[in-house]
């Protein structure tokens, strides 16, 4: 089977410099959703027709299995499909999809393909309560499809028809070439409509069959930011429903966004307003607090992530405790039972088993052993303005509050670092490290007093 995806439109109503098919739905371009669905049907040829912003669109979705045809002038859907003909296998049927219709299920498309076997012409239709703006399916007294009429060209009687054309078709490819060549642009838009091919198919004696999706939203397209927002909500609710079926507890299914792939174990609980981006894995018994953003991360079993935590490119072991208001940046690796608390930032660092950094700390480019306590206000000074250096803290170290570790530096096993210490040299095992300071008390000091107005 050939699959052609039309993605050449200008998308004027989007009011954006970004080509319409590249606007994101669930964090990925609209067109990428359509291509992924097309791939599940295992086509022999997959062709995307580009036009407006062609180079940008091609760069965004380029892949070994995707070919591109260019529609230099926007002369209608029939003209667009004609540009793809040289890339198609004439011996195989062709399925035509749209780059701005991202939610059509593969099962719906397969049903249409099956209905159109043996050289039939298949149309995906849907019956709407309000069909305004769509091409109507015109049938004869026996119920056979005779033609498709566009909204602007429809008679008052035809405008009453509720069954509409979605634009998605399956057609014999060899005949399609002839039919597209016979199209005329004698319509209100002066365009070559792909929908006019159905009349040519009927005239040629081909049987025209129809199929409908399980859900109306499968055929919804995007022509404005409002429609994009509507489809985003539909998609996210579908994702939430699937998570609920899999046993995930969602505090409010309407307030979770998955912009990638979220894999959950048993008894996972997710509070409101959480966003998951890229590839995220949550093992069994993970609890996510409200307003968290988690991107490209793996979270071990029994972990608790408290509210307002941001995690990006991190690996968390089992039974870790994160947040609230913590930030784990790319390269953060936490072993089992590690704690990273409020207003702690970890970047490109390993935190060992049972180690804790509970408050107001920056840990960057560091290797921290097991059972280490990092006091509040500790900073690893890893950057000299040109280069990054690592800090190594071995097992069972106690780091007092307000400590600075100037990398590159190593702190040996079992060291205790006094509060307010700056470490710029390696520290041997088991010692107390501190900066000698003299505390002075001055008598007779009078604190300034505000003047009364």
Swiss-Prot record:
Catalysis: reaction(s): alpha-D-glucosamine 1-phosphate + acetyl-CoA = N-acetyl-alpha-D-glucosamine 1-phosphate + CoA + H(+); N-acetyl-alpha-D-glucosamine 1-phosphate + UTP + H(+) = UDP-N-acetyl-alpha-D-glucosamine + diphosphate
Binding positions (Mg(2+)): 100, 223
Any one Gene Ontology BP term: lipid A biosynthetic process
Record: residues binding UDP-N-acetyl-alpha-D-glucosamine: 6-9, 20, 71, 76-77, 98-100, 135, 150, 165, 223, 329, 347, 362, 373
Region (N-acetyltransferase): 247-453
MF (Gene Ontology): glucosamine-1-phosphate N-acetyltransferase activity; magnesium ion binding; UDP-N-acetylglucosamine diphosphorylase activity
Location of this chain's protein in the cell: Cytoplasm
Required cofactor names: Mg(2+)
Segments of this protein annotated with the region Pyrophosphorylase: 1-225
Comment on bound cofactor: Binds 1 Mg(2+) ion per subunit.
Family: In the N-terminal section; belongs to the N-acetylglucosamine-1-phosphate uridyltransferase family. In the C-terminal section; belongs to the transferase hexapeptide repeat family.
NCBIfam families in the record: glmU
Protein name (database record): Bifunctional protein GlmU
Source species of the chain: Burkholderia orbicola (strain MC0-3)
Gene: glmU
């Amino acid at each position: 089977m050939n699959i052609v995806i039309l993605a050449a439109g200008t998308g004027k109503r989007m009011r954006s410099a970004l080509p319409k098919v590249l606007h994101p739905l669930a964090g990925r371009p609209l067109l990428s959703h359509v291509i992924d669905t097309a791939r599940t049907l295992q086509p022999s040829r997959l062709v995307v027709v580009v036009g407006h912003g062609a180079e940008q669109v091609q760069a965004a979705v380029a892949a070994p299995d995707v070919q591109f045809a260019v529609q230099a002038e926007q002369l209608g859907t029939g003209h667009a499909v004609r540009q793809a003909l040289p890339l198609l296998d004439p011996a195989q049927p062709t399925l035509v999809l749209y780059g701005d219709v991202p939610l059509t299920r593969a099962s719906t498309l397969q049903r249409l393909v099956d209905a159109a076997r043996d050289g039939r012409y298949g149309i995906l239709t849907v019956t709407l309560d309000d069909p305004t703006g769509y091409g109507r399916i015109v049938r004869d007294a026996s119920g056979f499809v005779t033609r498709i009429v566009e909204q602007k060209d429809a008679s008052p009687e035809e405008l009453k028809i509720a069954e509409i054309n979605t634009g998605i078709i399956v057609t014999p490819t060899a005949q399609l070439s002839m039919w597209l060549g016979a199209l005329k642009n004698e319509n209100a838009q002066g365009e070559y409509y792909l929908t006019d091919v159905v009349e040519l198919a009927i005239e040629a004696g081909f049987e025209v069959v129809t199929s409908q999706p399980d859900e109306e939203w499968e055929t919804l397209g995007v022509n404005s930011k409002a429609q994009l927002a509507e489809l985003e909500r539909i998609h996210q609710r579908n994702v939430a429903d699937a998570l609920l079926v899999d046993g995930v507890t969602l505090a409010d299914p309407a307030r979770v966004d998955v912009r990638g792939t979220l894999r959950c174990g048993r008894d996972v609980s997710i509070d409101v307003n959480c966003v998951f981006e890229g590839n995220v894995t949550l093992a069994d018994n993970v609890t996510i607090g409200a307003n968290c953003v988690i991107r490209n991360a793996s979270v071990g079993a029994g972990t608790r992530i408290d509210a307002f935590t941001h995690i990006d490119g991190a690996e968390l072991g089992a039974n870790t405790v994160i947040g609230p208001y913590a930030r784990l940046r790319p390269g953060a690796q936490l072993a089992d039972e590690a704690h990273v608390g409020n207003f702690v930032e970890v970047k490109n660092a390993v935190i060992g088993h049972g180690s804790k950094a509970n408050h107001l700390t920056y840990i960057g480019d560091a290797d921290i052993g097991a059972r280490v306590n990092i006091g509040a206000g500790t900073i690893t000074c890893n950057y000299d303005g040109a280069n990054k250096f690592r800090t190594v803290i071995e097992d069972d170290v106690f780091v007092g509050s307000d400590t600075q570790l100037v990398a590159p530096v190593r702190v040996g096993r079992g060291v205790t670092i006094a509060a307010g210490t700056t470490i710029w040299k390696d520290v041997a095992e088991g010692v107390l490290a501190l900066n000698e300071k003299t505390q002075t008390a001055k008598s007779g000091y009078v604190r300034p007093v505000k003047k009364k107005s």
